[in-house]
Amino acid sequence: MAISEATELLVKLTNLQAKFQKTLTASLSVHGISVTEYLVLRRLDQAPDKKLRRIDLAQAVCLTPSGVTRLLNPMEKIGLVSKEAGARDARVSLVAIAPAGETIYRESSVTFADTSRELLASVSKNDRESLSRIAEALLKG
């Protein structure tokens, strides 16, 4: 059975994502967080009022609502995030970055940036720009 070009590309992209996630999580472990937790803190830090509905956060970090809940529970226990009821609707669960989460996010952003540079060091600036455009198109599609 012939393997399609699309299949081969997706296998390479999946392996690349796994490599990046493993390397970034290892680097971020000195801050006590994983790459997925970093992405949650990053998204919350960038959000208006530094809070989001749980479902919007899940979508922003490409997790299911139950997956983001499983991720947030330990983060809440160690004080990185807090959960709040929505001002307009108490049934809506909001997640906010806590002060400790802001500190960890700021400190870990330096590590994330350094590791990102190392991971992409062999790729030219033009290729990085092209890859960024391709990634944006794939994420939208």
State what each model feature region is.
Residues 1-31, 78:
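N-terminal leader segment of winged-helix/HTH proteins
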Residues 1-4, 125-141:
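C-terminal regulatory/oligomerization modules of transcriptional regulators
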Residues 14, 42-49, 109, 136:
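Short, locally clustered residues in the helix-turn-helix/winged-helix DNA-binding domain
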Residues 22-64:
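N-terminal helix-turn-helix DNA-binding core of bacterial DNA-binding proteins
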Residues 54, 72-73:
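Short, hydrophobic-biased segments on the C-terminal half of alpha helices
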Residues 73-133:
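Charged, amphipathic alpha-helical coiled-coil/dimerization segments
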